[in-house]
Amino acid sequence: MRRGERRVAGGSGSESPLLEGRRSTESEVYDDGTNTFFWRAHTLTVLFILTCALGYVTLLEETPQDTAYNTKRGIVASILVFLCFGVTQAKDGPFSRPHPAYWRFWLCVSVVYELFLIFILFQTVHDGRQFLKYVDPRLGVPLPERDYGGNCLIYDADNKTDPFHNIWDKLDGFVPAHFIGWYLKTLMIRDWWMCMIISVMFEFLEYSLEHQLPNFSECWWDHWIMDVLLCNGLGIYCGMKTLEWLSLKTYKWQGLWNIPTYKGKMKRIAFQFTPYSWVRFEWKPASSLHRWLAVCGIILVFLLAELNTFYLKFVLWMPPEHYLVLLRLVFFVNVGGVAMREIYDFMDELKPHRKLGQQAWLVAAITVTELLIVVKYDPHTLTLSLPFYISQCWTLGSILVLTWTVWRFFLRDITMRYKETRRQKQQSHQAINNGDGHPGPEDDLPGTGTAEEEGTTNDGVPAEEGPSAAS
């Protein structure tokens, strides 16, 4: 929504938020409605600057004779023109801070990335890998073999110099990356249980797929102590504390020039990088079959996106420390939060004609396209059969989940309806026996048993006072 369309507090004497249409999980917002130059779309300004830049390149700059350079420059210029159009003209998403144009930019980057993936998908395996040389000449060569796992002793008595060398070897740059990554994922998902399930499930996936990717082979304490408990667990804990603060925060906004003090202005600038309002996510997966399947789908896509990170590096011959790997993670950090909010709104929307948000649609398409690239570029690795005990564990887990689903959303409801019907019948029979029920069919017939039950004759005379009694 545009800046001028946001909720504005009404009345000059009191700050009363507009509560109409606000969900119970959504925070109250006070806004004075200031619409400054900063919030405008600047469509004509961007068009003028873009036209001047293109005119300068066309009329004043000499075109180089290097075909490869001109090709790269033309592709980059085409992408920049598309980004300029999208940033000024694309539809706004659910987020507006620090600026709606920021999120429109990442939406357009999503389109560019998806088109790039489609291009790679339609190349041969050799051409696709060699094409990356145009991005970085160091790419397009097979990755060297590395030794993973190795000695898993926490205390290595044979190493007299440093018995804990195995632990220090694991304390690399991936430790803060795990912590920061799960802190940000918690801000996206906004649910402790879902975060922990995804964290634990991914470790099980690493166990299951280490025969396909050697870098999944880690020590047991690296999986469960360093990853799940320390890095991931601490990131989730800090993320939940941040969510608690955001849900309790007062969202009161004033225009920068309406604040009299310099301290207030600086505070307002800092708060520009915090949410405009806050919605507490209540996924409630067990409330209905629809929400249960949706939450399972979200977890599946999350795990698939995590696996794509490692498989894409493997099949495209990309070193883990390459900047393209980092850029992909930065990309998903920015688009993931918007996608999760759009999915939650889609699930929470009661309108009959719902539409999935644009960013969520693109994230799903990107995740599937990445998987298809992995399948096409190295089918041999993906078809390596799981060890028998691993496949047994996943089969048992799938049966348990399927059994719980059938019981919770089908058998349990049938059983509860049967018990409720039986209880109502018992209450009805008990009420009739106690004389508190409604008249039955026989009670509508005149003179049938009514006199005997009431101790009267059919003429309404008490039985003791009738002719037989007098005689």
Curated annotation (Swiss-Prot):
Chief place where the protein resides: endoplasmic reticulum
Entry protein name: Phosphatidylserine synthase 2
Keyword Lipid biosynthesis appears in the UniProt entry: yes
Molecular function terms from GO: CDP-diacylglycerol-serine O-phosphatidyltransferase activity; L-serine-phosphatidylethanolamine phosphatidyltransferase activity
UniProt region (Disordered), positions on chain: 1-26, 423-471
Swiss-Prot/TrEMBL catalytic activity: a 1,2-diacyl-sn-glycero-3-phosphoethanolamine + L-serine = a 1,2-diacyl-sn-glycero-3-phospho-L-serine + ethanolamine; 1-hexadecanoyl-2-(9Z-octadecenoyl)-sn-glycero-3-phosphoethanolamine + L-serine = 1-hexadecanoyl-2-(9Z-octadecenoyl)-sn-glycero-3-phospho-L-serine + ethanolamine; 1-hexadecanoyl-2-(4Z,7Z,10Z,13Z,16Z,19Z-docosahexaenoyl)-sn-glycero-3-phosphoethanolamine + L-serine = 1-hexadecanoyl-2-(4Z,7Z,10Z,13Z,16Z,19Z-docosahexaenoyl)-sn-glycero-3-phosphoserine + ethanolamine; 1-octadecanoyl-2-(5Z,8Z,11Z,14Z)-eicosatetraenoyl-sn-glycero-3-phosphoethanolamine + L-serine = 1-octadecanoyl-2-(5Z,8Z,11Z,14Z)-eicosatetraenoyl-sn-glycero-3-phosphoserine + ethanolamine
Residue ranges, Cytoplasmic side: 1-40, 96-104, 313, 376-381
Membrane topology: Multi-pass membrane protein
EC main group: transferase
